[in-house]
């Protein structure tokens, strides 16, 4: 029964713990590391079903008290509803909240802080104690260097330096060193302050070489000021192929035949250790040579060559630099090689002495039929012209610094002479000109054996009309050489004969010397007449432009080129054989527009209503690309083509026009050209009709007026005679006054106006009444008592016609005021007249 008690209590506690743990969930690093004087940053998060957190207590090494059912220990931090109670040192800061963040910071941290930190969390419904391990050392603990499993030379690797520490309030840095010297490669440093891990890491990438093998790499922990705190070191294990060097005895690797040579393959470094050794000569492996030392006893000349050693390990083979071994020996027995054998008399023969030796022979001795040939000490003996006495046995002896070789078997020279004194004869008279037919014959003095055939060179499609005769039709130009050979068993070639064909100059062409670019008007221009060859070489030059001879020099110069110099040029080169002309070469001169003028179609006088085309003609190269038109007021017209078309043309278009042309070189403008637009017959007819009608109407009115006036006068005259009254009538005609013609202005153009005014003016004079009788009027005395309603009047009239031309643009020769003045004075009978005011009435009749 007593045994069941503790187990039952344990089960109850486990159940309670399990029930509480289901309500709480924490995440934080399991263990945190620091050192005396540093700080600790504890990232922490939690999740509780009851988020109403009432208190938070941070214990150091907490222990559960069964009696009080509470935890005992040093309280580093406490937070309750009543407020915060800071620790004595005020080192602990709670950086979280009452929701999910339980992050803490201890700064500074001490060694006695090591142990367990207990986070006591209490809510209304649950409690929980979360434990965190803290490890604080007296001194800064070293970082840890992590290397890849294997490092090979020239392969990039990453070195990692890891420190299980990071705190926001305590900055640190990690420094890489190689053999105590800071490494040049840039390292990448990163930190982690998460609920999973807290660390500072530095990664360094570099490509190790075999020389780095065994070197010490250090990762040094420093504070913010660069002060050393701790470090970690590792030794690099760089896998590499064997590194080799050959040592030769003698050191210059030059020995004489029969001497010994020792070559030692020194392995300066190999990781891992080498396993196989081999030697190579000229790239081929030497058999049974698998040690680091190669001994060559009594070397021969065949052992000369390039030697190297090859040593392999698990990484691969390593090969040393090549050593060239030279084995020196005296010349071996000589042999003679005869070139061009058998030899023909007159030909050339070359003898070559061949003997193997190292170093090469420096002196040779030649023998002819056992007799030393004086002055022949070279490797080759050349006889330019073999004669019959040159036949026989030839041998030689070679010599170098090691000794003199032996004379080998001789070589026999068999001289069989071909036909002697073979000559090629040109049958034609000289000189030979291009296109001639040339006949050559092959002659000789003697031959043994007899001549059986002839050969010619060079070969061509030539004709051999007979044995030993060659005929060349239409011989070509150039320094052609012909040689013939008279052949028996061998051929004997005659000395080549140059046909020396003369020809006219060839490949004549015109070449521009300057300028190198486009030719503009005013440039200095030089043309060169070139040709490839001429025979004879004495030549003359002629320049021609458009069929006209210009000069007789090889170069044609223009100090200041003008557009008139443009054209087709060709040059002629002649010698005593003939002349050759070049292809026509066009000289193009670029210049601004010039000689501009305005041409008018159909002419400079155009009837209104028709069409008129103004064309801006110019001389330019390149052609005009832009035209501008201007009127007589120098106003630019909105036309930019070469032709200005006016359709239909009007009288208002009359005036002066000019144009301006522009190209890539410059611009130019034309002089003024006047366009006159005159009236059409229809317009003139209409205006003449209107003018004639107006004049006719005025004339009719004037005639009618005169007739009416005369009738009125007769009527008044008759009434006066009947009334025995005295009256006087008279006409007054104005004196014609010559006036200066109207000035003709520049714009005296217009239409006839038929409505010009003619005027007839009337005037009436009234006299006061009088009873004084007139003397001399006895015949009319019975009429002296006029009726009381009659009054004395004088009627004065003027008929005035204004002189004017029929048309407004036709001015009369003179202008004058001409009028017919008619006046009639009537004196009525004497009698009592009523008092009346004297007055003058004017009447003006206009028509």
From Swiss-Prot:
GO terms for cellular component: early endosome; external side of plasma membrane; extracellular exosome; neuronal cell body membrane; recycling endosome. It is found in: Cell membrane. Coiled coil: none annotated. A motif (ITIM motif 4) lies at residues 840-845. Residues 143-235, 242-326, 331-416, 419-500, 505-582, 593-676 form the Ig-like C2-type domain. Residues 709-847 are cytoplasmic. This is B-cell receptor CD22. It comes from Pan paniscus. The lineage of its organism: Eukaryota, Metazoa, Chordata, Craniata, Vertebrata. The gene is CD22.
